């Protein structure tokens, strides 16, 4: 036993909500290097669907500094953040999301 029993909340990531698989190139394994607007369009579409159809949805996307930090990518992330802010998104850490979920359950 490692301690008293407790609750576990998993906040899963999704490959289609990560930047790495869309923009990085690994020869023989990963095509990557897709146009930056493709990623932005996909992320916006998924977010807009969640806003319209999934009350209380958690949109947990994953970004990597070596990928999203490039000039042409960081501007797309900024566009996504503005898009989300305009639609009332709550930006929170995973700990804050876990706490809010705990209070709601």
Descriptions of predicted regions:
Residues 1-55:
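Active-site-adjacent pocket scaffolds in enzyme catalytic domains
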Residues 40-105:
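C-terminal domain-boundary segment and adjacent tail
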């Amino acid at each position: 036993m490692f301690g008293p029993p407790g609750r576990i909340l998993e906040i899963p990531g999704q490959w289609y909500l990560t930047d790495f698989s869309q923009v990085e190139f690994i020869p023989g394994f990963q095509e990557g290097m897709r146009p930056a607007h493709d990623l932005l369009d996909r992320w916006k579409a998924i977010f807009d669907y969640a806003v319209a159809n999934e009350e209380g949805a958690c949109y947990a996307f994953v970004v990597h500094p070596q990928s999203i930090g490039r000039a042409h990518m960081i501007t797309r992330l900024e566009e996504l953040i503005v898009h989300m802010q305009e639609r009332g998104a709550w930006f929170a850490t995973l700990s804050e999301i876990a706490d809010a979920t705990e209070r709601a359950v």
